[in-house]
Amino acid sequence: FETMGYLSQLYIQMGETAKARELLEKMAAMEPHLTSTFLTLANVCFIQEDYQAMEEAANKAIAIEEGNAVAHYLLGKARKGQNDDLMTIAHLTKAITLKDDFIEARLLRAEALLNLKQYKEMMEDIDAVLAQNPEEETAMLLRGKVKESNGQGEEAEEDYKLVTEINPFNEQAYLYLGQLYINQKKLTEAIGLFDEAIELNPNFAEAYKERGRAKLLNGDKDGSVEDMKKSLELNPKEEANLNGEFKNLGPKSEALPGIF
């Protein structure tokens, strides 16, 4: 059994999630009283984006050990994957009640609260996280989103820029800052920022997409099409979203040939 556990961890590290999951499911059947097996299984299901199976595994862990904060966190994460913000918040609140300094749970709850525009409650989580770690990047980005939502664009920009300075490889910071520039009609700044992001990571699909959007708004249709095509090449799942981006580009044949 111990060897199976080591092997499942090795599969996870190698990215062989299907093999890891198969092994963990066998382990769960052999020793159905071990919380750790179900927690690992839930994490593997998360990697596979199988949120219903993740929820089942987390629930089984809770049935074994009701007071396990990580199990409640994973259950909240599973509901988040199914776009159920209310139940996400409920499960994460339970996790935080069990473990008050649970940074990951507070950050995930803050994201769900952002979706519901519950900014006051969201800031309570963000402040609690930043009190533990003043340079927690996700907390700073979420604080920026609150400021942006409240019409404080300059203050939001400061938060986003600060994160890019702390960690130049934080891609979410570039996306938030670039999207803010686009909303503010600072299209040249947005394009320049995404140039920088793509230089740091030439496979940054979202940066190509957002740069394409900025170029389109700036009147550069050809450049926009090239960026959108590159984004789609890097992330084929985005095809439906890209179709929407080009709805104002005239005949489909002039927009992105081959994907419509």
What are the functions of these language-model segments?
Residues K145, S149, K161, F169-K185:
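Alpha-helical adaptor scaffolds
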Residues M14-K26, Q48-K60, G81-K94, L116-A128, ...:
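Structural signature of tandem alpha-helical TPR/SEL1-like repeats
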Residues F1-E2, T35-S36, A69-V70, I103-E104, ...:
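Helix-start (N-cap) detector for alpha-helical repeat units in TPR-like alpha-solenoids
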Residues Y6, T40, L74, L108, ...:
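Canonical tetratricopeptide repeat
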Residues L217, D222-F260:
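Terminal, low-structured helical/coil segments at or just beyond the last alpha-helical repeat
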Residues F1-A18, E22-M27, H33-I47, V70:
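A generic tandem-repeat structural signature
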